[in-house]
Amino acid sequence: MAKTLKGLRASTFVDKTFATGSGYTIENKKKAIALPYNKALKKWVRLTLPSTGLSTVVQVLDVGPYLWWDEEFILKGKRPMAEWFYENDCAFPSVTDGHKRWGDISFAGKVPTSRASVDLTPPVWWDLGVDKTENELRSFSVDDMIMEWFVPEPIILEQEEDDEMPDWLKL
């Protein structure tokens, strides 16, 4: 059964390398979301942006922001760990605790700079109706994203190149 959480902070990422391989480039315009749990990789989520009323389904191709073990968020639907550290002005620990490898993150011992709990590539924002350039999106975020996870992979039907009605549909 899919989980839904409202009021997520979503920000933009344009990493050239994802945990799953090659990342986003201006040329490939790869659609992806990063979630803070490595076992979410290759799964699908539905995002809805209330301000535009649009939704899209996108694959998890990277981990983050900040963490890759936030199972309370992803598996149990609790608020993201990064939100708590940000809102309480609390630094991330810098000591490894089992699979929580605090010492391995670049923000170890620092307060997160944002409460972002998901990162999106620019084409995902465009699918959600955000009319900003790639450069403008680099500093763009919203606080009202709705995410439903995990959902079935979308079925994408190939479109006729000339957009004419196929013969088999004509009366």
Where are these regions (language model features)?
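Secreted/periplasmic proteins
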Residues: 1-169
